From Swiss-Prot:
It is found in: Nucleus. Keywords: Activator, Nucleus, Transcription, Transcription regulation. The gene is MED11. This is Mediator of RNA polymerase II transcription subunit 11. Gene3D superfamilies: 1.10.287.3490. Belongs to the Mediator complex subunit 11 family. GO terms for molecular function: transcription coregulator activity. Its main location: nucleus.
Length: 236
């Protein structure tokens, strides 16, 4: 298949690219001329500006030509001498009927460029895919069984944990009760209980009692004195 049409398009785009590069070069020289202190700055500035505008016009014209050529050859293959069709990006290849023959020819050429694949290689690839799928299924089954085992183990261990927790709670509550009794004892110790003591002191006597005691004492003294007098009389 001839590729002159495609090559022409590539050459045209390359020329446009070169013109854009030269345009940028001329713009840089224009700024250098403007910043220099030569006497003929005005003439050189004008000539370089004219060259820049001419390059811009050529680039615009060439781009418009390429856009026109691509627009004319989109979806058809009889607009150029090589019969090349330009496909847009959004074209559905399954539903279009334009350029089907050319498309099939290009696919055959691509298949010819690829190395041939033997049947043994195809079988090896299919066997490897099958083994990989079997391994994936085994791993999935193992994961499911592991999840089931964990669920059963959790269902068994949960009652044991609940029993342990209840036993721990009862153990924790019993020391609390004992401590409460001890606290009561500590709050009211036996030594600090106010027990009324038996009074060992003699009962207090009033003022009248004191007078009676003094009178009794005087009587006793008088008796003693009389006894002493009697003894002296006996002795004499």
């Amino acid at each position: 298949m001839s590729e002159t049409f495609i090559q022409e398009r590539l050459d045209s785009l390359y020329e446009i690219d070169c013109k854009i590069v030269s345009l940028l070069d001329n713009i840089s020289t224009l700024f250098q001329t403007y910043s220099s202190s030569d006497g003929d700055v005005k003439e050189s500035f004008a000539s370089q500006t004219e060259e820049i505008y001419s390059i811009l016009s050529k680039v615009a014209i060439d781009l418009r030509k390429e856009v026109k050529v691509m627009d004319d050859n989109i979806g058809v293959y009889d607009k150029n001498k090589d019969g090349v069709m330009i496909l847009p990006i959004g074209v559905d290849q399954k539903n279009t009927t334009l350029g089907r023959k050319k498309l099939n020819e290009e696919l055959k050429e691509l298949e010819g460029l690829l190395p041939p694949v033997s049947k043994s290689n195809e079988e090896d690839i299919s066997m490897a895919d099958a083994e990989q799928s079997v391994e994936i299924e085994k791993n999935a089954e193992e994961d499911k069984t592991q999840v089931k085992k964990e669920a059963v183990q959790e269902s068994i261990t949960e009652p044991e944990k609940s029993n342990q927790s209840t036993n721990e709670e009862t153990k924790e509550t019993q020391p609390d009760q004992i401590e409460s009794k001890d606290d009561i004892k500590q709050e009211t110790p036996f030594n600090e209980i106010n027990i009324p003591k038996e009074s060992t002191s003699e009962p207090e006597l009033g003022l009248g009692a004191d007078i009676d005691i003094d009178m009794d004492n005087n009587d006793n003294n008088n008796d003693d004195n009389s006894n002493v007098d009697d003894l002296f009389e006996d002795i004499l």
